[in-house]
Amino acid sequence: MKYKRNIKLDYLHTLVRNINFTQSFWLLFLLVVKDFSLFEVGLLEMVFHLTSLSMEVPTGVVADVFGRKISRLLGIFSYFVYIFIMLFSGNFTVILIGFIFCGLAFTFESGSGEALVYDSLKLMGEEDRFMKVNGMKEVIYQFAGAISLVASGYVISVSFNLAWYLTLGFYVVAMIVILLMKETPMLEKAKNLKLKELLYKQYVESTRIVFRNKRLLYLTIIGAMIAAPITTLYLYLPDHLDSLGYSYLEMGLLLGAHSAFAAIGGYYAHKLEKKYKEKKILYFIPLFMVISFWLVLIDDAIIIPFILLGFFDSIFYVVLGDYINRIVPSEIRATALSYGGLMFSLVMVIIFPFIGLIAQLNGLWTGYLILAIITSLFYLFLLKVLSGNHLDKI
């Protein structure tokens, strides 16, 4: 029962860490305050994802060997550095370094938080609750996002810098919450391994498990192919809405509505999966996402498909996370889960700057058109995987 507290503390951590007043307006901040071009912003995001790409697995090793708490704390300290650079530097090179720290912040958290929660449940014999717990975590995540998005529309209308200071304060609280968590004990054996054995166990064994297990590999690839286009659309949206004449407050309300519907999706994910099962979820939820991408191109109707994307994305995220965690052994969980972040970053490194360049030359509407085409091609790949029964367990 001592690990039960971890679940509640993780809910609290998810809340305070994601009351982030910069999450949807950092791009606008760089364009308006730092006077960067869309192409420069695309390069910065590419650096972020190159950092994620190169550091996902190493930071997963840190989590599995030295502790999931240690990894999460290192992530918060890295984000502190990123915030200070964004506040006090206008130099492109220095801000580029800041994005490296931002990438580190996400990779240290990626996999480690999920691994800590899943293994806490496993130690209590309640791992079957993970989808429900992860769904509730998604609700809290989106609720926090909705609060910060609605509020940030007002905050940045007062001062962009205020948004960074407020976010810094919530990250301090998040750090305290992590310190109160109890580490899972499966790490003790790993701590006693020699360096050579450790490297073999964490890199070679994790890689073998991910790439030899066809089901795990395809689920990881599919997750990246769905998440990257949605993230790209989301990050460029404030600039697109600005060009359509939306005020900062209206942007905040729209982004907040997106998060609110995402929270609903997270809450109902385990119920929908229980009713419709895996294949229907994997066939139809991504299909609805593809349709939403095409509807986003209609400027007068952009609100509805964007809000629905939040709903479908959360369902897919929660369900996919459960499918993947069922396969992965506890002792390499954070490392193996990091491959999902690695593949996501690989797709983002290509897509995000490419869409930024298209938008710079021909406008964001054209960029979104290309994004809709890319998403449709990804869905065709998913159909091929499903029709070939490549997700059958082995």
Regions found by a protein language model. Give the residues of each.
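Juxtamembrane intracellular "pre-TM" segments in multi-pass secondary transporters
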Residues: 1-4, 183-221
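Helix-loop boundary and gating motifs at the non-cytosolic
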Residues: 2-54, 213-256
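Transmembrane alpha-helix termini and helix-breaking/packing motifs in multi-pass membrane transporters
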Residues: 32-33, 145-167, 243-244, 350-368
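Helix-to-loop junctions at the C-terminal end of transmembrane segments
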Residues: 54-67, 156, 264-278, 359-360
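C-terminal ends and interior cores of transmembrane alpha-helices
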Residues: 77-90, 287-299
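Cytoplasmic helix-loop-helix junction between adjacent transmembrane helices
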Residues: 100-142
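Helix-loop junctions on the cytosolic side of multi-pass membrane transporters
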Residues: 164-171, 175-194, 384-394
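C-terminal transmembrane helical hairpin of 12-TM major facilitator-type secondary transporters
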Residues: 279-320
